[in-house]
């Protein structure tokens, strides 16, 4: 049985603050006279402010592979969005500056408040509610949602999962959480810190299913969760698009990043990165 699809317009209307999904970050100067000095000098030559002159500082939740994650062996941040961020930095002639991982649902408030990070990237869906708080760049990738269950599970359809006693894991603050709350109202929706916790919980039988971005769940099933699956009808066509989060107070930076993204698309860089991380263009 196929899952009910929502129109992109309807889906986006429901989504609250927080997304899918995970962005890179660079260390940021604290608020104060030295911070404002860096911002002023950055704006004088570029048309936008930076928390640290000459660097593009980013925050993200680094538990959302293949978009943003930390390499356990090297300790380096990596992923499709990390590579996109570094490519944008190169276009802007800025050095990357990545801050330690943060909770996903703190990203939008942090960028809105300012003073810590310039941008966030990490499979963050553009929604109307989020746009009330921060600005997004133009979209750089399309996405949908998905439901993941354990192979052999008796409950795999939306009707079966939308029942009392069913435990559905989601990452807190994401569009996956919004979709689950709207479409599985009879089930218990369990918000977690990251998608790895959600999928591991399904694997161990703690949860009946999880809902998350399709590119992420597909990647994780291939990499580490061979006993999980996206059941027939489990791909949910929500028509989402990812964008880079920027403060509303920094329109010049949004404009500069949009220009960089356009150049990365036209020169083939985006296609190359998609093939590197997804095996094909999306």
Task: Indicate residue ranges for each PLM-predicted region.
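N-terminal secretory signal peptides
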Residues: 1-10, 15-26
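Acidic, polar ligand-binding/catalytic clefts
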Residues: 95-160
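A ligand-binding cleft/hinge motif common to bilobed small-molecule-binding domains
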Residues: 105, 124-132, 178-181, 203, ...
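Bacterial lipoprotein signal-peptidase II cleavage site
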Residues: 28-41
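Extracytoplasmic small-molecule ligand-binding "clamshell" domains
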Residues: 44-122
């Amino acid at each position: 049985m196929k899952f009910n699809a929502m129109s992109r317009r309807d889906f986006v209307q429901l989504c609250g603050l927080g997304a899918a999904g995970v962005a890179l970050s660079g260390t940021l100067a604290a608020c104060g006279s030295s911070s404002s000095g860096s911002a002023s000098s950055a704006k004088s030559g570029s048309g936008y402010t930076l928390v640290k002159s000459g660097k593009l500082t980013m925050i993200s939740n680094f538990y959302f592979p293949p978009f943003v994650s930390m390499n356990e062996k090297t300790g380096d941040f990596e992923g499709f969005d990390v590579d996109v961020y570094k490519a944008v930095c190169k276009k802007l002639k800025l050095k990357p500056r990545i801050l330690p991982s943060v909770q996903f649902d703190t990203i939008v408030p942090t960028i809105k408040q300012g003073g810590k990070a310039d941008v966030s990237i990490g499979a963050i869906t553009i929604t109307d509610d989020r746009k009330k708080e921060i600005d997004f760049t133009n979209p750089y990738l399309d996405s949908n949602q998905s439901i993941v269950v354990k192979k052999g599970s008796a409950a795999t359809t939306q009707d079966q999962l939308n029942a009392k006693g069913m435990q559905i894991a989601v990452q807190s603050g994401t569009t996956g959480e919004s979709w689950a709350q709207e479409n599985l109202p009879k089930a218990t929706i369990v918000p977690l810190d990251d998608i790895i916790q959600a999928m591991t919980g399904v694997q161990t039988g703690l949860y009946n299913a999880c809902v998350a971005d399709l590119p992420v769940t597909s990647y994780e099933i291939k990499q580490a969760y061979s006993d999980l699956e996206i059941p027939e009808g489990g791909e949910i066509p929500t028509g989402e698009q990812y964008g880079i989060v920027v403060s509303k107070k920094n329109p010049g930076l949004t404009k500069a990043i949009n220009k960089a993204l356009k150049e990365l698309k036209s020169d083939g860089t985006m296609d190359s990165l998609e093939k590197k991380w997804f095996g094909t263009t999306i």
